[in-house]
Amino acid sequence: MLVISIDQIPRSPEELIQLSKYIPSFVLSVLPIGSVWIAHSSWSRIFGLQDRFSVFLSLLLVVLVLVFVYPMKLIAQITVEYFSVIFDWNFLSTGLFESESWSSELVWVIFLYVAIGLIFLSLILIAFYQNTLKFGQELSITEEETKHCITFSLIWGVVAGTAVLSMLIASIVSPENIQLAGYIYFSLFFTTVVVPIQYFKYRPLTPS
C-alpha cells in the first residue's frame, strides 16, 4: 500500500478502501515495466553478454525505467478512471477527472511522455539484440538464438512504431477523441504476433 500511495499510509478503513481504488492502475502501470524487465532478464539469461556497450545499455535502461515510472502510473490512472466512467464502475473511480488539477486540454502531453518513453525503451531493447547478433561467432549463437534475437527486435520495433502512431494521434485529435491515442496500443496484441510470423515467412533463416 505504501508503494501505491507513495506518501501516505491508510489510518482508517475508509482511507484503506479509498486507497484500494488505486490498485488497478498500479497493476496496469507495472505491466509495461514488467515486460521490459522480463525482456532484459531473458536476454541476459540466454546470452549473458557483458561488453561495454551492453553494460551501457543496461544502465541506460535502468535510468529510463525510473524516469518512465511516473508518466506510466499517471496514464494508468487515467485509463482506469476512463473505463470506470464508461462502464459506470463507481467502485474504481478516484475522482481524477473532477479534481482541480485535471485539464483535459493537456492530456495529450501525457500520451506524448508515455510514447517517447516506450520508443526509447524499445530502441534500447532492440540494441541489446542487435548487438548480440554482432557477437554471433564469439558467442556461438545457434540458428534458434538468431531467430530469437530477430523476433524480439521485430516485436519491440512494433511497440516503438505503435508509440509513434499514438504520439501522432494525440497531437492531432481533439481532447474529446484523445482516447484514440490509447486505443492504438490494443493493436499490439495482434501486431506483435503477426509481424514476426510474416517476417520469417518471407525471409526464412534457412532458405528452402
Feature annotation, model-predicted:
Residues 2-208:
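Multi-pass alpha-helical transmembrane bundle typical of ion/small-solute transporters
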